[in-house]
Amino acid sequence: LGIGDEGSILGSIPHGVDTFDSTFPTRSARHGTLLTRTRGRVNIRRSENSTLHEPPCWECACRLCRHHTLSYLHHLDKAREPMMWTLATEHNLHYMGWLMRTQREKILNDEV
């Protein structure tokens, strides 16, 4: 469909689109991008992440955010460790699930 990033989804929902099939969260993860509530898109490959000993998103309850830091993820990516892509994919899918739950609540409350 080509509708998969946050902006496209949020722009489509008010027009009645309620089904999305996209590789965006997994492709973003493979390219080192984490989708977060508090920081927006985080490019784990940026050098400043090598010294940030904090989770990618404080508000996220996924395994990556509960147990790993940006500096560790940066290290995994630099080492081309497949675990980085697995954790990032899981996180991005968790984020997209959260995004859709919040939109569903807004629809039920007539806020969209």
Language-model regions: role of each:
Residues 57-112:
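C-terminal extensions of enzymes
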Residues 1-56:
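Glycine-rich phosphate/ribose-binding loops and adjacent secondary-structure elements
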